[in-house]
Amino acid sequence: MKVIFLADVKGKGKKGEIKEMPTGYAQNFLIKKNLAKEATAQAIGELRGKQKSEEKAHAELVAEAQSIKAKLAEEATLVEFTEKVGPDGRTFGSITSKKIAEELQKQFGIKIDKRHIKVDSPIRSIGLIDVPVKIYQDIAGVIRLRVKEG
């Protein structure tokens, strides 16, 4: 019996795969537990349509991520922070990924999740700093910061 997997089943198949399975195993285990459904012509058509729409959505997200990366690469995209500085040259407050995300949204209208901004430790020094950011899956960019004395 041909089945379409609705979820990953260890040793049998992954979600979205169409495979030939023993009839008893398919009916009594896979279909009852909603791990798979019978591969009828209609179900296969639905699966193909769903895969096409997922590919289209993925392509749109990649295009959006590429445009964000291009915006970040422009010379004009320099996120500025004005912080109070102590006598040792370190800022009183630290600049975290949350602050960077908020300033990027406020200054340039670029929305990036703070969890994707890779700050090893909070920034406490003044000057120009490059911070890596993961925009989408394998698309990464760099946010340029200028921290100046206020």
From Swiss-Prot:
Keywords: Ribonucleoprotein, Ribosomal protein, RNA-binding, rRNA-binding. One of its GO terms (biological process) is translation. It comes from the Bacteria. Pfam families: Ribosomal_L9_C (PF03948), Ribosomal_L9_N (PF01281). GO terms for cellular component: ribonucleoprotein complex; ribosome. GO terms for molecular function: rRNA binding; structural constituent of ribosome. Belongs to the bacterial ribosomal protein bL9 family. Binds to the 23S rRNA. This is Large ribosomal subunit protein bL9.
